From Swiss-Prot:
Pathway annotation from the record: Porphyrin-containing compound metabolism; protoporphyrin-IX biosynthesis; coproporphyrinogen-III from 5-aminolevulinate: step 2/4
EC number from the UniProt entry: 2.5.1.61
GO cellular component: cytoplasm; plasma membrane
Pfam families referenced in this protein's UniProt entry, alphabetically: Porphobil_deam, Porphobil_deamC
Assembly and interaction partners: Monomer.
Cofactor note as given: Binds 1 dipyrromethane group covalently.
Taxonomic lineage from the root: Bacteria, Bacillati, Actinomycetota, Actinomycetes, Mycobacteriales
Family: Belongs to the HMBS family.
SUPFAM superfamilies per the UniProt record, alphabetical: Periplasmic binding protein-like II, Porphobilinogen deaminase (hydroxymethylbilane synthase), C-terminal domain
Gene name tied to this protein: hemC
Native species: Mycobacterium tuberculosis (strain ATCC 25618 / H37Rv)
Listed name of the protein: Porphobilinogen deaminase
Coiled coil: none
Keyword match Cytoplasm: no
Length: 309
């Protein structure tokens, strides 16, 4: 029996259940084990709780032998590698884009100046301000139902959340606008899951690897390399999205490449630095580092310094 650790929220258990069900479909026995994390217990802003707020307890449970594997929202994992563990599988990614849920079916551009928009993410807040729509950004915590209720109750005019979370909970009907990357770059690894286990458990690593999706792994590897090189945690105002795209060589043959777009935003929305690049899927990390280097050249370090101080 493979014991899969998960946070206790409905979204987390729903995500972990997709991994459990895929393992069972592959002929393996698997069950979910709920682990409480600091991020679930505290209502303080995520950025104030530090790195690994949703993942440390799950890793401790693996280390203690309480669970064999853990399912994380990949964007919550610290960028610094922990040699005790390995991400054995990255299943096919859900839609990485952000989504708006607004009153009266409105889009961001239709909301009146001064409308209250809730988000838990400095990245979203910075990019929302950069759109110059005159919206008032408000902090937002709690599970997805709690966040959605802020709109239906009239406390907020709109919220911006990950579309993937709404999809996994069957709440896409609530979406009034899906934000394209040109409007708002998502968080690195948004919409992707990381299935982690102890690095020394080679038998389990091999079993979990059956769930791995090569395109998703390449995209997430590039996005996370960019994030790590910027020395930015999961709550920093950094956006990135990579996609496997088809290109044509000089002989007319179709081949696949990896396209990466990244940005760093000032928290007040006064500046957004953007860069992009393209490379081979097998050199995803190098692509991430290359785009990060371009962001640095364009002034990302100074923008990040302003964020940190």
């Amino acid at each position: 029996m493979i014991r899969i650790g998960t946070r206790g929220s409905l979204l987390a258990t729903t995500q972990a259940a997709t991994v459990r069900d895929a393992l069972i479909a592959g002929g393996h026995s698997a069950e979910l084990v709920t682990i409480s994390t600091e991020g679930d217990r505290s209502m303080a802003p995520i950025a104030s709780l530090g790195v690994g707020v949703f993942t440390t307890a799950l890793r401790e449970a693996m280390e203690a032998g309480l669970v064999d594997a853990a399912v994380h929202s990949y964007k919550d994992l610290p960028t610094a590698a922990d040699p005790r563990f390995t991400v054995a599988a990255i299943p096919p990614r859900n839609d990485p884009r952000d989504a708006v849920v607004a009153r009266d079916g409105l889009t961001l551009g239709e909301l009146p100046v001064g409308s209250l928009v809730g988000t838990s993410s400095p990245r979203r807040a910075a990019q929302l301000r950069a759109l110059g729509l005159g919206l008032e950004i408000r902090p937002l915590r709690g599970n997805l139902d709690t966040r959605l209720n802020k709109v239906s109750s009239g406390d907020l005019d709109a919220i911006v959340v990950a579309r993937a979370g709404l999809a996994r909970l069957g709440r896409l009907d609530d979406v009034t606008e899906t934000l394209e990357p040109v409007q708002m770059l998502p968080a690195p690894a948004q919409g992707a899951l990381a299935v982690e286990c102890r690095a020394g458990d080679s038998r389990l690593v091999a079993v979990l690897a059956e769930l791995d999706d090569a395109d998703t792994r390449a995209a997430v590897t590039a996005e996370r390399a960019l994030l790590a090189d910027l020395e930015a945690g999961c709550s920093a105002p950094v956006g990135a999205i990579a996609e496997v795209v088809e290109s044509i060589d000089e002989d007319g043959r179709v081949f696949e490449e990896l396209s990466l777009r990244g940005c760093v935003a000032a928290l007040d929305g006064s500046d957004v630095i953007r860069a992009s690049g393209i490379g081979s899927c097998g050199r995803a990390r190098e692509l991430g580092l290359s785009v990060a280097a371009e962001l640095f050249e364009l002034g990302a370090r100074e923008l990040m310094w302003g964020v940190r101080h």
